[in-house]
Amino acid sequence: MFDLNQSLFLRALRRQPVERTPIWIMRQAGRYLPEYRKVREHAGDFLNLCKNPELACEVTLQPLRRYALDAAILFSDILTIPDAMGLGLYFAEGEGPCFTNPLQDTKAIHALKIPSIPESLSYVFDAARLIRQEMPKELPLIGFSGSPWTLACYMVEGGSSRDFKRILNLIYTEKEAAHLLLNKLAVSVTAYLTEQIKAGVNAVMIFDTWGGVLTPQNYKDFSLAYMHQIVQQLKNEYPDIPVILFTKNGGQWLEWMAETGCDALGVDWTCDLASARKRVGGKVALQGNLDPAVLLTAKNCIRREVGSVLASYGYGTGHIFNLGHGITPDVPPENVAIMIEAVHEISPQYHL
């Protein structure tokens, strides 16, 4: 029987020798694939797709059928936890995620209940079990959650935001309420990732999409502290499950992030991979960091830029190739194949 620990992805995460650099793609199950669009249309809307384990399983498997990827990522949304807390998640056409009951004052934060994660988000764990059963046995499955800070941003703003005025006002003027909210979310995220691990995921990733809007001290206090808490609790219970942290626009804080006890850091395209490796490569693996815009260019440009990312990381293990953020819906599927082939062809020379 195949030992999943021998997979390229898990070996690279643990900084063990590999024959080539593993690759997966953030949002690899997504709107750039015509087969995904067909299933989403059948589901009626994005949330129905997330809440239907069979359909979530199908779209998770689609990119694996099309491409030689080294891991699958559970198909879900980062806002399932706030939805389970009763905020009423919905997706407005062209606007992204919104809540019918955003947290409009400190009273709402005090009243917010920590949900029973196994019951309220059972559809996520059912999907994870089904995916693990149906997907290739030799490939790892990645589970994920939004970070407490990122979830709080959406919950207080009521959806996406350009300036995050409400949540930033909260941390400056109602510090205690902000910490109460983040603590409730940290407890929920820990329970959520624990249940995903029980359902069969082989690694977990915490997406801190909005950590980069904070000052350094506020990042430490309101984002990193809670991710640290989650990592410690997961590692206490599941020391062998790798944890990846990703703060978008957080390249200046890699040293702090590496101190949390996580196994790897995701880096976006604004971060120089060679200097990131010098700074924290002795402690953690690095995942990234091709600019997603490269996938909208021609074959020779894609190959050149893939080569640049691989050369920037350099020789040896500890690198998982990925984009610096999620793949965009306008990417031609054939360009993804060009990127993956380039990683397969160019990376072995760095692992001799």
Curated annotation (Swiss-Prot):
GO terms for molecular function: uroporphyrinogen decarboxylase activity. Disulfide bonds: none annotated. Substrate binds at R27, Q28, A29, G30, R31, D77, Y154, T209, H325. Pathway: Porphyrin-containing compound metabolism; protoporphyrin-IX biosynthesis; coproporphyrinogen-III from 5-aminolevulinate: step 4/4. GO terms for biological process: protoporphyrinogen IX biosynthetic process from glutamate. Keywords: Cytoplasm, Decarboxylase, Lyase, Porphyrin biosynthesis. It is found in: Cytoplasm. Its main location: cytoplasm. PROSITE patterns: UROD_1, UROD_2. The record marks D77 as: Transition state stabilizer. SUPFAM superfamilies: UROD/MetE-like. It catalyses: uroporphyrinogen III + 4 H(+) = coproporphyrinogen III + 4 CO2. It holds the Pfam family URO-D. Its EC number is 4.1.1.37. GO terms for cellular component: cytosol. Homodimer. Belongs to the uroporphyrinogen decarboxylase family. HAMAP family: URO_D. Catalyzes the decarboxylation of four acetate groups of uroporphyrinogen-III to yield coproporphyrinogen-III. This is Uroporphyrinogen decarboxylase. It comes from Legionella pneumophila (strain Paris). The gene is hemE.
